[in-house]
Every structure is written in structure tokens, then in C-alpha cells.
């Protein structure tokens, strides 16, 4: 898929084994909303990155991006997309949300991270785009370490549950109607 955002274009590889934003017309508007809200971006930690639908277009807004995803097909396609687009500031790892929290807390070593210098990151933002089940308690705890949080949700019910648990201030919020005439909505929220 070739995606155009503002004055740039990206090729994002996908197949039927991975998730990608379903509404091609709203997708650039979602990216635009996120980029307009960014304040003082340094490095980005992204959980549930999928095949890179947000990773690739947001990479130019951050010094470095560390993107994690548990689906091996998604990570493989993301790595290929990074090469295809000649991006050098993105590192990836196949880690679940809980494994990412463990890795950042230095609770145990991961061979999958042996070539990644986690200490070199100066994370200013965390971006989460969880499945419909929402965030795990470990991810909620991890996110509290970050001043800025971008929460993308396809399930308003679990989003509301998580917002209460997070106890953060909502800076801005946008709702995208991905499937007209249905109850399915995509929420993008900036939290501090």
C-alpha cells in the first residue's frame, strides 16, 4: 500500500496475516491529527505497532522510534517496509506489551534485544494501539513512566476503562468513524 501524508509518501507492506487501518480515506487524517498534537518529540516507544501503519509516517517526527509487536508476520513486514522506505531511525523487536515492560524495567534479558541499546533512547512519548481488549495492567504501569501518551483505540468501552485506570489528563481527543453506520469508532487521545 502506498500512503501519502502531507508532503511525503510511504510504502507499507501488508498481507492477510496482519492488521492495518481499514479506512484508507481516514488513515491520513489520523496521522495528521497525531502530528499536529506532538509537542517536543524526542524518541518514541510504540507498543502494538502492527506492520507499521503509525510507525513509518511518524518516524520523521521523532529522533528515534522503538516499535514492538508480538505478531511475527507484522514485525517481518515492518522490517521490510523500513528497508523499502530507507528509514534509519526505527528499531523493532518482536515483544508483547508485557515483555516490553519487563525489558524496559531490566527485569530480565531478551535475546531479541541484544543488538539494541535501550539506554540510548530518550523517550518523550509512548504510543499504544492495543487490540479490542485494551491495555494490560503492566502496560498501564509502564505508560505512567512517560510524560506524553498517545492512545489509539478501536474499542471505546475498553478505552474508557483504561482512561480511568491511567488517571491522566486528556490533552486532545479525536474520533474517527472507520465504518459508517456502525458503532465501530477509532479514538485517538493525547494524554499527559
Model-identified regions with their sequence ranges:
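Rossmann-like S-adenosyl-L-methionine
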Residues: 1-192
Amino acid at each position: 500500500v502506498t500512503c501519502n501524508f502531507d508532503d511525503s509518501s510511504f510504502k507499507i507492506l501488508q498481507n492477510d496475516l496482519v492488521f492495518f487501518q481499514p479506512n484508507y480515506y481516514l488513515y491520513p487524517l489520523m496521522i495528521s491529527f497525531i502530528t499536529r498534537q506532538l509537542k517536543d518529540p524526542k524518541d518514541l516507544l510504540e507498543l502494538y505497532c502492527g506492520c507499521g501503519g503509525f510507525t513509518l509516517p511518524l518516524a520523521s517526527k521523532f529522533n528515534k522510534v522503538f516499535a514492538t509487536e508480538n505478531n511475527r508476520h507484522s514485525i517481518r513486514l515492518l522490517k521490510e517496509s523500513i528497508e523499502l522506505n530507507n528509514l534509519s531511525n526505527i528499531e523493532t523487536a518482536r515483544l508483547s506489551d508485557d515483555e516490553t515492560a519487563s525489558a524496559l524495567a531490566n527485569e530480565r534479558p531478551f535475546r531479541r534485544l541484544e543488538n539494541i541499546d535501550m539506554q540510548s533512547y530518550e523517550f518523550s512519548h509512548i504510543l499504544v494501539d492495543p487490540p479490542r481488549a485494551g491495555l494490560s495492567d503492566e502496560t498501564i504501569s509502564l505508560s505512567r513512566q512517560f510524560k506524553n501518551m498517545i492512545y489509539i483505540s478501536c474499542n471505546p468501552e475498553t478505552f474508557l476503562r483504561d482512561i480511568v485506570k491511567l488517571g491522566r489528563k486528556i490533552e486532545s481527543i479525536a474520533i474517527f468513524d472507520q465504518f459508517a453506520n456502525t458503532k465501530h469508532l477509532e479514538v485517538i487521545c493525547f494524554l499527559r
